[in-house]
Structures are given as C-alpha cells and as structure tokens.
C-alpha cells in the first residue's frame, strides 16, 4: 500500500512538473514575444488600476510577469517569465518559479507586477542570485480597496505588488515562496 502511494505521488509530481515546464515556451534567446506581452500587460493593468498608474510614476522599477501558469493536484507548481522595466526600458529578464504541496487541485493563469519604490529594494533584486519572495524587502499586495488609498506620500519604500488577470480554477493565488531568478537570454 505504501509503495502504491509513493508511486502515485511521484506520478503526480512528474505530471505537475511537466505541465509547468512545458505550458509556456522558454525565452530561448528571443525576447521579442516577451517584450510584447509585457507591454500589453502593463497597458491592461494601468487601464484597470489607477493605483498602479500612481505607483508607476514614483517607482524606481517595475518587474512584470505577464503570464504565470499554476497547476496542482496535491503537489503543485507555477512558472512564468517577465521583464524588469526601468525608465520605460527593459533592463533584464526574469523567471518566477514556485512549488507547493497540500490540499490543492486545478490550473490557473495570472500575471503580476511588482513596483520597486526605493533603491534598496531594487538593489536587493539585482544583487541576489535568486530572490525568494517573503525573504528580503517587504512586499505590500495591493487590492482594490487599498488601491483607492494609495498616495505618493504613503509609497516611499518597499515593493507594491498587483496580481491581475486570473483565469482558471484554483483556490487562492499567492506569491509567498516564489523564487525570482535573472535570465540570461
């Protein structure tokens, strides 16, 4: 019986790993498609969220992942690729990867944008060889209610994150434990 459970868990982990790794093509040196997706995602976010527009005016940089795929059945994972924008120009490419286990089932796509409000937070990203969210600079997740109260005087430091464009069915979306790593196209 224990052997059967172990085999089932291994099969589920392989299924999740395969789905996460192959649902989106890797960047593989061609960044044009990713650049277009980033531009489109930022325009959509700014059209829907006045708070994101306010933050973008004061932010030192914006790290945006236009499409992150999350799948899971007891064991889960997520993967997405994005770009770091400074002064309206792409200065680097990153991926986000996370794994999880527990009571979960489903598949979902979403995007997220992180607004770096101070130099220290941006330097932490640039100097780390893989940054795990939840370790390092503080991150504030902005929802509609909070977004209405954002002013330039309240957003001087740290990182503000927006999760948007959720499609699919999976209980909850979180970034805790996600690891962000710089890509070398």
For the regions a protein language model found, what residue spans apply to each?
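C-terminal segment of classical bacterial N-terminal signal peptides
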Residues: 14-25
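Exposed boundary/loop context
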Residues: 4, 21-22, 69
């Amino acid at each position: 019986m224990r052997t059967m459970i172990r085999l089932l868990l291994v099969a589920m982990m392989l299924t999740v790993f395969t789905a996460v790794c192959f649902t989106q093509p890797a960047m593989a040196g061609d960044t044009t498609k990713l650049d277009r997706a980033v531009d489109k995602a930022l325009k959509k976010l700014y059209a829907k969220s006045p708070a994101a527009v306010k933050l973008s005016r004061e932010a030192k940089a914006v790290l945006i992942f236009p499409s992150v795929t999350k799948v899971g059945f007891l064991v889960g994972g997520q993967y997405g690729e994005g770009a770091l924008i400074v002064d309206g120009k792409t200065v680097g490419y990153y991926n986000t990867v996370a794994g999880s286990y527990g009571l979960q089932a489903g598949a979902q796509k979403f995007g997220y944008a992180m607004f770096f409000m101070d130099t220290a937070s941006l330097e932490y990203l640039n100097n780390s060889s893989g940054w795990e969210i939840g370790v390092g600079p503080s991150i504030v997740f902005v929802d509609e209610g909070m977004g209405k109260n954002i002013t330039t005087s309240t957003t001087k430091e740290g990182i503000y994150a927006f999760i948007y464009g959720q499609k699919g069915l999976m209980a909850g979306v979180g970034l805790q434990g996600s690891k962000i790593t710089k890509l070398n196209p």
